[in-house]
Every structure is written in C-alpha cells, then in structure tokens.
Amino acid sequence: MAGFGLPNFGQLTEAFRKAQQIQQNAQKLQEELDAMEIEGSSPDGRASIWLSGNQQPLRVRLEPSLLAEGQDASETAILAALQSAYEHSTTTMKEQMEELTGGLNLNLPGMSD
C-alpha cells in the first residue's frame, strides 16, 4: 500500500540497491585513483611532478640543466609542473566521478566547476 504519499516498497528497495551499488563502485574508484600516476610538466619539460588520482604527491623529476639556472628558474618550473599535474588529476577525478554517478547530478562537494 502506497498511501499517504509514501513510496511503494519496491521503489524503496530499488533505491537502496542503487545506493549500495554506488557505494561499492565508489570504493573501487578510490582504489583506482590511489593507484594512478598522473604527470604534470613545466612548459619546457625540465620539471615533472607525478600525483595520484587523489592529488597525493608521488614523485618529482628535475633536469640538471634546470637546477644549474638557479633557484628562481627552478621554483617557476616546479610550480608550473605542480599546477599541470593538479589540473590533470582533478580533471581525471571529475571524469571518473561522473562515470560512477552515471549523470545522477549529485552535486558533490569539490566536484563542481
């Protein structure tokens, strides 16, 4: 009986089933993002930074020629590489979350533009 504006039991059961599936998929996605290595590089390619899909720093590579140019050049290149890696990582995370939610428009914190 679906009186008094309450959903019927079948709809409620289906909603819970979908919620459980999303939760399982979210756990799998978390593991996949943790395992990813996403590279960002400075425009000249002499500085590279790798982040996980969850923006955890993993590695840094600096070419000796960059270090020879001094602190300012090194800092500028490192910042550019970090910004590039962060942009790639957040884009990847957003795309993966959109796949997970299947366009449910959940409006998750930190996932909006």
UniProtKB/Swiss-Prot annotation:
One of its GO terms (cellular component) is cytosol. InterPro entries: YbaB-like_sf, YbaB/EbfC. The keyword Translocase does not apply. GO terms for molecular function: DNA binding. The keyword Mitochondrion does not apply. It is found in: Cytoplasm, Nucleoid. Keywords: Cytoplasm, DNA-binding. Pfam families: YbaB_DNA_bd. Its main location: cytoplasm. Residues 90-113 are annotated as: Disordered. HAMAP family: DNA_YbaB_EbfC. Belongs to the YbaB/EbfC family. Homodimer. PANTHER family: NUCLEOID-ASSOCIATED PROTEIN YBAB (PTHR33449:SF1). Binds to DNA and alters its conformation. May be involved in regulation of gene expression, nucleoid organization and DNA protection. This is Nucleoid-associated protein P9303_00241. It comes from Prochlorococcus marinus (strain MIT 9303).
